[in-house]
Swiss-Prot record:
The gene is FAM222A. PANTHER family: PROTEIN FAM222A, PROTEIN FAM222A-RELATED. It holds the Pfam family FAM222A. Belongs to the FAM222 family. This is Protein FAM222A. Coiled coil: none annotated. InterPro entries: FAM222.
Length: 452
């Protein structure tokens, strides 16, 4: 036996057969395998052992001699004369530091792992780190026994959820319950992804409401009223931002609106009157300048809806202008010449380009941006109405159209509120996540998720 052990120590990587025939080969192989066995049990073995003795937690397990069990002197080590077993040097919270170092098997109703805290009430005795027997109450058993950090420090940071919007009156359509997108300065950080499905579900409800055959047309349109934005520009009230007011007694915004000289800080776009058999047209979007324009020599008429911008009474002949990276806005706007629109236009999402005369028309249809005379401004002119008569009529209250319009309006001003919404149904102070900005190479294959 001693010769076998000596030969094994000389060549530890080989299982040598004993040359002496007086010793059995089986004993020699057993000794050699014991020398190479693992000293500590694996987690699977510990779990199996915990399940086996779960019904009798006070059973005694005699470990073999080749497995080292940490002793009490190993738990209270000192470094430079200081005791490091106290809570001061422990990287774990206080309620778990008292039980570090020893494995405790607690009897419970369902016990799947020795390191997890049992779900049911338990009465057991285990040794603490100081080697003293401690009775555990059911309240103390719920604390994690294994020396792991608190679960709250392992997960992501919890964000407070914004307050829920009040429920609308039953008589109002579901399209008026969408939350507004207001990225205020200082609070413009994106919310956690747990709040993202809410705006998509609201957009989907908005889409379904506006695509209904019997949907009320005023549910998808709103009147825009300018007011100064002190949150963005401080005390300077000359930079207007747009608030979608929502009184129930507003005049019909589907008729052409005359803009006087005093109301030129923001352009209110309203749809023109449509024939009786025409399908419900789209949103009346809003485009506002970044600085107050000079008063025009004569009142302007803003057209949107089914009216072709090139056929408006104020439109005059002009040269064709190249499209400035595509505008998702679906309104033909009469703007003063001091405001240049092209540099703010963003690339359309899903490669869908919406124009005043289209209801989510085919992206292959050409869009011509004309630059009008010196007294007028650039307008977005789409294909004529007869060219779109053969296309399937869709409502512009579409998820992609709404998101593309919001994305383009984000380049104009920091305060964005979605159209198709009346502020009466919104309440005050509710904020949701803003539509993210896209780079130039990201506009081709992006689709917003729709929850059905």
């Amino acid at each position: 036996m001693l010769a076998c052990l000596q030969r094994t120590q000389n060549a530890p990587g080989q299982h040598l057969a004993c040359p002496s025939k007086s010793l059995e080969l089986r004993k020699c192989e057993a000794v050699a395998s014991a020398m190479h066995s693992s000293r500590y049990p694996s987690p699977a073995e510990l779990d199996a052992y915990a399940e086996k003795v779960a019904n009798s937690p006070l059973s005694i397990k005699i470990f073999p001699t080749n497995i080292r069990v940490p002793q009490h002197k190993h738990l209270s080590r000192t470094v430079n004369g200081y005791d490091t077993s106290g809570q001061r040097y422990s990287p774990y919270p206080q309620h778990t530091a008292g039980y570090q170092g020893l494995l405790a098997i607690v009897k419970a109703a369902v016990s799947s792992s020795s390191t997890a805290a049992p779900a049911g009430p338990a009465k057991s005795v285990l040794k603490s780190a100081e080697g003293k027997r401690t009775k555990l109450s059911p309240a103390a058993v719920q604390v994690g026994i294994a020396p792991y950090p608190v679960p709250s420090t392992l997960g992501p940071l919890a964000y407070p959820k914004p307050p829920e919007a009040p429920a609308p009156p039953p008589g109002l359509p579901a399209a008026a319950t969408a939350a507004s997108v207001i990225p205020l300065p200082g609070r413009g950080l994106p919310l956690p992804p747990s709040n993202l499905p809410s705006i998509h579900s609201l957009l989907y409800q908005l889409n379904q409401q506006c695509q209904a055959p019997g949907a009320a047309p005023p549910a998808c349109q709103g009147m825009a009223i300018p007011h100064p934005s002190p949150a963005k520009h401080g005390p300077v009230p000359s930079f207007p931002s747009m608030a979608y007011s929502a009184a129930a007694g507003l005049p019909d915004c589907r008729k052409g609106t005359e803009l006087g000289q005093g109301a030129t800080q923001a352009l209110t776009l309203a749809g023109a009157a449509k024939p009786a058999g025409y399908a419900d047209s789209g949103l009346d979007y809003l485009l506002w300048p970044q600085k107050p324009p000079p008063p025009p020599p004569q009142p302007l008429r803003a057209y949107s809806g089914s009216t072709v911008a090139s056929k408006s009474p104020e439109a005059c002949g002009g040269r064709a202008y190249e499209r400035a990276s595509g505008s998702p806005l679906n309104c033909g706007v009469g703007l003063p010449t001091s405001f240049t629109v092209g540099q703010y236009f963003a690339a359309p999402w899903n490669s869908v380009l919406v124009t005043p005369t289209s209801d989510c028309y085919n992206p292959a249809a050409a869009v011509v941006v004309t630059e009008l005379g010196p007294g007028a401004a650039r307008e977005l002119a789409g294909p004529p109405a007869d060219a779109l008569s053969g296309l399937p009529s869709k409502s512009v209250c579409n998820t992609s159209v709404l998101s593309s319009s919001l994305q383009s309006l984000e380049y104009l001003i920091n305060d964005i509120r979605p159209p198709c919404i009346k502020e009466q149904m919104l309440g005050k102070g509710y904020e949701t996540v803003a539509v993210p900005r896209l780079l130039d190479h990201q506009h081709a294959h992006i689709r917003l998720p729709v929850y059905r």
